[in-house]
């Protein structure tokens, strides 16, 4: 696998080595050993999958401490624009984002560490989205930033009249009104100290 660094430290794009022939293709989608060697130590404990139609926008989600989550995300059917926003107070990249297109054709994965809000928009007719999490879902720690926050400068590539958001996601605060529970100076991976 090739690890591509982004403009924000910790956010990385992973391109697997894909073997293609007349029968189709094969690739190793995850190796704990290689991930820890090339990215960071992490212990994924939950895999999730969603199916969404064109225009669906999910996010920007996170879980508050002590239930923070890292995510390793990919699109196995269709195409999405995947986005992570740095919400660590004191970070030199606070409020900045990285957007990457994930698709069934490029097989890319995107690693979103703890301390980031995450979301995606479906660009194809339908999309099947999978993600690994390193902490279990904790509804009491659920949080989010408004996916429509224009101050973030995200081009979601979805016309406003085509965007489909959940009632919960519509109610998220904009970044300027948000008091982040994450601090850049605090180790968000204490289990690996």
Locations of regions flagged by a protein language model:
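Non-catalytic, conserved peripheral segments adjacent to functional cores
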Residues: 1-105, 124-126, 133-142, 146-193
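Short beta-strand His + acidic residue motifs that chelate non-heme Fe in jelly-roll/DSBH
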Residues: 110, 118-123
